């Protein structure tokens, strides 16, 4: 099995990290049902070895970053916090693009303030084109240039991308050094196979979201049968498959439950045989 660490920016991080999206209220909007539980989950994540947390100030909005600060500040030196800009929330909880220079600059400063930081470790430009639900072609030069300028000002250490096409990745790499790409990818949704391999060749991290499908979890009898045969959960198998898919894949499964967090972290110890991997590879063709 590949190494359990990978370099993100200038730090080595454990490949099984934590996504903070579910720490906000229902629909990633408003406060959590129990703030104490959210704080406990974050502290337990670090106790279990997590040193890569994915967040955004548009989760809540503001909520997850404020909880992260309350739970973990002052931050340990080995912790990498990755955030995203490029979207905002409407009063009705809708997800809206926020791509103007002023909106991008405000988002960086909102993240800094709510996390209690002077500089952000990694900022992903979250691209919302087309219907906003998946990557769509279109130039990101203007928006990325704004983010690169904030990097030059010392507000951002490293830059990443989210919800992008291969063409946009190539465009971005001509403007700034890109340390990670965050797209939807899982055992059933494998449109980025070629991108993952190309990024791995260049030492760039790939961070899949929705590891078991989007807000409607993947229903696969094959996955369920494999999980049962291994004495594992479908999510654990899906995470283990991703870890073995490529050494540059960093995982950020999210949860608001300590028990579920521990289940997710146990996936790191689950080794899938070549026979099992071959069976699971067939899910994308079902």
Question: What role is predicted for each listed range?
Answer:
Residues 128-286:
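Beta/alpha (TIM)-barrel catalytic core signal, keyed to glycine-rich beta->alpha loops juxtaposed to Asp/Glu
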Residues 1-79, 285:
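N-terminal binding-site loop/beta-alpha segment at the start of enzyme catalytic domains
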Residues 22-36, 91-102, 131-136:
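Active-site mouth loops of central-metabolism enzymes
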Residues 50, 117-120, 156, 178:
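A structural motif
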Residues 78-91:
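A short, structured active-site edge motif that brings together acidic residues
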Residues 112-133:
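Active-site groove signature of glycoside hydrolases
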Residues 10, 47, 69-80, 113-116, ...:
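Acidic (Asp/Glu)-rich catalytic clusters
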Residues 31-45, 99-115, 165-170:
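Short, acidic/polar
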